[in-house]
Amino acid sequence: MASNLPMSPQLEQIHGEIRDHFRALANGFQRLDKIKDSTRQSKQLEELTDKMRECKRLVKEFDRELKDEEARNSPEVNKQLNDEKQSMIKELNSYVALRKTYMSTLGNKKVELFDMGAGVSGEPTAEENVQVASSMSNQELVDAGMKRMDETDQAIERSKQVVEQTLEVGTQTAANLKGQTDQMGRVVNHLDTIQFSIKKASQLVKEIGRQVATDKCIMGFLFLIVCGVVAIIIVKIVNPNNKDIRDIPGLAPPAQSRKLLYLRNQDYM
């Protein structure tokens, strides 16, 4: 359906580039399913992310061109082109969601395995604890239990502080990353706008150049006609009896000199 839409050459070129990127994304995700190595999967995902970023830029450029040509198209054509734009946006969003799924799966695979080898522990065994407890009085047992509880409470408090500090650092890092992401988004949008303006300016310069060349040709042709007319007028004035040159319409030939007949009086009588 999209190939039969009435598009300008500029819109058709952008639309073709977007469709090429979509085909590359589909093939890339199919290859990703066959890759088992995590490092190669990460590299493949980075390449697909770059293609999705380029797709996003092209969709924005397609939207700008569509708005620029909206006044020259019929309402029906504008509706069809807008529907095609929404379809491309949905397709791009589906690839973005698929990328997030693969990123989550890849992150779950990166789990470190610890070797829990059997070794000599520095903690006393249960048998040793029973022997020590049997030799202690009740007050000593209470004091030892309170000391162990205090140590446990202190360890829990230290763990809470570490968790709070980690959350604070994570929140600050997320805020910084969000600010940097927003700034990069604004920079990308600004660059897209500049690129679009440069293309429009180039098209305008080409159009002006064609108009100037046409005007020069017309002026040169008119100049040759004027020179020819002036040359014919000069030749007719200098040599009025030249029959090889036809008279110019609207230009009367030079008046003949009058010849008066002189008669003598007696001849007249």
Swiss-Prot record:
User: Topology versus the membrane, per the UniProt entry?
Assistant: Single-pass type IV membrane protein
An annotated GO cellular component? cytosol
What the entry lists under SMART domains is as follows: t_SNARE
- Give residue spans on the Cytoplasmic membrane side: 1-217
Subcellular location, record wording: Membrane
Which GO molecular function terms does the record list?
SNAP receptor activity
Enumerate the Vesicular topological stretches: 239-269
Q: Which parts pass through the membrane?
A: 218-238
Where it mainly occurs, coarsely classed, is membrane
Organism the protein comes from: Arabidopsis thaliana (Mouse-ear cress)
Q: What is this protein called?
A: Novel plant SNARE 13
The task this protein performs is described as: Vesicle trafficking protein that functions in the secretory pathway.
The residue ranges of the t-SNARE coiled-coil homology domain are 146-208
Q: Which residues form a coiled coil?
A: 33-94
The biological processes this protein is annotated with in GO are: protein transport
Q: Which UniProt key words apply to this protein?
A: Coiled coil, Membrane, Phosphoprotein, Protein transport, Transmembrane, Transmembrane helix, Transport
| Phosphoserine sites (modified residues) | S74
List the cysteine pairs that form cystine: none
Query: Could you say which protein family the record assigns here?
Result: Belongs to the novel plant SNARE family.
